[in-house]
Amino acid sequence: MAILYYDEKKLFQLNTENTTYVIGLSPEGYVGHVYYGPLLHGEPDLYPLRMDEPPFTPSVNKREKSSFLDRFPMEYPTGGVGDYRESCLNIRNAQGRMGCEIFFDSYEIFKGKRPLTGLPASFGTEDEVETLEITCKDPVLDLVVVLSYSVFTKENVITRSVRVKNEGSEALKVEKIYSACLDMDNEDFEMLSLHGSWGRERHIQQGALRYGKQLVSSGKGESSHQEHPFVALVTPGTDQERGEVYAMHFVYSGNFIGQVERCQFDTVRMVMGINQEEFCWNLKAGDEFQAPEVVMVYSAEGLGKMTRSYHAFYRRHMIRSPYNHKKRPILINNWEATYFDFDTDKLLDIAREAKKDGIEMLVMDDGWFGKRNKDDSSLGDWVVNEEKIKGGLKNLVDKVNEIGLEFGIWFEPEMISPDSDLYREHPEWAIQIPGREATEIRCQYVLDLSRPEVQDYAYECVAKILRSANIKYVKWDMNRQLSDLGSTYLDKDSQQELFHRYVLGMYAMQERLIQEFPDLLLENCSGGARFDPGMLYYSPQIWCSDDTDAIERLEIQEGTALIYPLCSMGAHVSVCPNHTVGRVTPFTTRGHVALAGTFGYELDITKLPEEERKLIPEQTAMYHKYHELIREGEYYRILSSRENHRSDCWAVASEDKSEVLVTYVQVLAQANMPSRKVRLRGFDPAKKYRLEGTDEVYSGEMLMNAGFRMKDFWGDFVSRLYHFVAVD
């Protein structure tokens, strides 16, 4: 069994293949964190809770309990009763007083895992996952708090979530509810997180853990370009293969916080959940509230082991799409080719040329509906513009299908333009504060998805289009953050529920979409902003960044691949000079970098120089050859140009280590230097490998210890693939 309970010791032990998590109970019923680390083969003990040391437990010291609470490693700390570190749960009662104290009541252990109502969450069979639910109660508030732990043994993952229920007769206010907490002794930890901006998302940053609080967060209504719902604590010197890592990743697409607090007694508290700013939930008598899920990973073998745990877990237990283990079509998107300036003839020209070179799908991006000839109108008016799309959408789709390509289409269902028929008819459907001039971003407002009729309208607009033609792919976009938080639908006491209700509404729409169109390939897109595990639950891939420059993408994709499988990262070959940074890179390098993702094209193939055009059939053949390895294989980070400023290298190995694909990018050339010798990863040290295209044979242990020579590189931004295949 993955989960054990020792009644005499009052201990829960949660085991994966390589890790153990231990929870203990104090005599009073406080739920404490005992241990998280390498697998324990015997019974654990309670002594790490330090209950036999001053200030002792409240039942022993017979005095005030605050000194105990402020030191005790709480499994789920509550606010207002004497623990002055960051709390996870703040409850205000009907009299306006804030305070909550929970005590152990009961537990349940069962095989499998229950879904989280209205939320994305991991899943697994009874053979793959086991769950512990610890029920706690606050007898004063008549509040039930259920702490849920699901153990995915093979992937070395533990997921956590919390739900609360008001069993009293008076309404309560949930002013803060985080999903997970980890209390530990400090071991000179450093904090690792992902930061960025539009066009440079998910850059890795790492620094010393200072006394006080350090955090990442979003208050924008999305997981955001700027910070990411992921935090890891690492021991000094941690690299890809060595060091301890404690990581949390939030399965949610709205406001979040991930915080680490180094406390006065040199302990560390790491918490993660919904950002409490502009959040308050009315919990009426009998009501429940379900908090989203956190995915926790511990690695004793550096960041690489953590990465591969997350990759395997998300592929097996988060992505539901039939495309998860299926070849995805090579698409060409017309956005950077045409922007808004296109019509049926132009799209068909692109389709004909794309077909010649092995491309399999045409995606029509923004500008096909309403009066949408630039970005200042028509969002919400999802009616085909037949001045552009002559003969209607079905006519276009049928002609693209006749050419031999599948067809995809772009939507931005959550938005509304001030200049739209929809806004003129229903201005109250936009999120805004009455009497205040609303903030426009990209000439648009955000629809109030807390309103059921708005969800229904937006969904039916999308579904009606999909029912009308043979459409195989949808790009679901979101190009602005939320502001001016006001809903004419919610009453005054529920306005602070709007952020969360918005996210729930978006989830409900996407759930309807994949239920009605189960074979649809859905790609979520927010210019790289709303890239989070919650969206993976609905779509197997997410657009990684609007910056398609191959060199910029190295750092973006390195940070993204730290926790997300390559098959989830939307990546395309685009034109040069690049539309974002103006850089010129070899077409081959652009293809190699895009191959470390979903692979596609974002360009006008009808205008491409011949020397680049002739490379497309080679690239599409490359994708067909390696797509399964990249989608299903194990990822190894070898070199980071972020760190060395010279070169980038990664590998993808099959699970049985029978083949390894290595990608090397020389970012900047260096004068008067010999070939670079790089210690590779991902090989079986006992096997021998032939380098494809040569007669060269290498042992796995030599490649990983002595290294492989990267030779015959000339110039900046050049790259090469090396495919190693095991030989008998």
Regions found by a protein language model. Name each.
Residues V231, Q240, S641-D684:
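Carbohydrate-binding surface patches
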Residues A171, C263-Y314:
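Extended acidic/polar, glycine-enriched regions
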